[in-house]
Structure formats: C-alpha cells, structure tokens
Amino acid sequence: MSKKPADGRKVIATNRKARHNYSIIDVYEAGVQLVGTEVKTLREGKASLVDAFATVDDGEVWLRGVHIPQYDHGTWTNHAPLRNRKLLLHRAQIDMLVGKTRDGNLTLVPLSLYFLDGKVKVELALARGKQAHDKRQDIAKRDASREITRELGRRAKGM
C-alpha cells in the first residue's frame, strides 16, 4: 500500500522525473473527477504519472496520460486506463493558468497523486522544461553540496 504522512495525505503515485526534467515555478492542488472503479484502483495504490501532463481546453483543465489500470474485480463498468480526467480548480486559478501557459514555454506537470480526507487530489506544477546543460548543472551543484557536508562531518568528528 501507499505511505500516509502525518498531514493526512496518502500518496498513491509520484512523478519522480518531474523535478529532474522541469524547473518548478508554482504548485497547485486540484481535485480529480473520477469514476467508481478508478477510485477503487487508486485505493489499491495502482497508478502511474510517468508520461502525464495537463492541458487547458475551453476553460477546463484536463489531466492526460495518467495510467490508472482497470479494477481487478470490475465488470463491464470498468474504465479506460488512459482516459482524460477533468481537474477541479477555482475559476480564478484556471484563468491564471491559461494566461501563464499561453505566454511562454510553460507546461502543467503532475507531481503526485494522493488521497486527502478521502478525496483524490493531484499536486500540479507550473513548470518550464530543462535543457541538458541545466540538468548537468543541477547534478554538479548537488554533488558539490554533498561533498561539502561530507567534509564538514569529517571535520566535526576530528578526522
């Protein structure tokens, strides 16, 4: 099953590559409009955000590319695994996202999918894609900071 931190969130799936491939500018929380068998599958902890993204079409935000497999015990009422799912946001948030995604090279990327008080939520990031050299710089910074903390630890121990 999934982990449940102290804030009441039960994380179902995370997009682990999102922070590597994108520079996160802003983060939003949105509800997800689901059918019954999708909720049952999510309660089992089965979902994938690997190729997922969100788009704004006709004043509505849609989550695309999220794979929620069919419910094992479902019948003919089962859902399509890769169907588009509507995200539930306030009108002001949608209007702001429309303006920001239209202006520049920004995209909407889901970071995680989780339960909050029994409702499925998605953590949606407004992000800009990273180039290969940006990724290399981030890795170099991370390695340098890791080396510094390691050296400080050695000095504190008196080695």
From Swiss-Prot:
Main site of residence? Answer: cytoplasm
Keyword Ribonucleoprotein tagged? no
What the entry lists under Pfam families is as follows: SmpB (PF01668)
Q: Which domain of life is it from?
A: Bacteria
Q: Name one GO molecular function term.
A: RNA binding
Which SUPFAM superfamilies does UniProt cross-reference here? Small protein B (SmpB) (SSF74982)
Please give the coiled-coil regions recorded for this protein: none
Mention any one GO cellular component term assigned to this protein in its UniProt record. cytosol
Q: RNA-binding among the record's keywords?
A: yes
Q: Which InterPro entries match?
A: SmpB, SsrA-bd_prot
Q: What keywords are assigned to this protein?
A: Cytoplasm, RNA-binding
What biological-process terms (Gene Ontology) are attached? trans-translation
Q: Which family does it belong to?
A: Belongs to the SmpB family.
Q: What does this protein do?
A: Required for rescue of stalled ribosomes mediated by trans-translation. Binds to transfer-messenger RNA (tmRNA), required for stable association of tmRNA with ribosomes. tmRNA and SmpB together mimic tRNA shape, replacing the anticodon stem-loop with SmpB. tmRNA is encoded by the ssrA gene; the 2 termini fold to resemble tRNA(Ala) and it encodes a 'tag peptide', a short internal open reading frame. During trans-translation Ala-aminoacylated tmRNA acts like a tRNA, entering the A-site of stalled ribosomes, displacing the stalled mRNA.
Under the heading NCBIfam families, the entry gives: PRK05422.1 (NF003843), smpB (TIGR00086)
What is this protein called in UniProt?
A: SsrA-binding protein
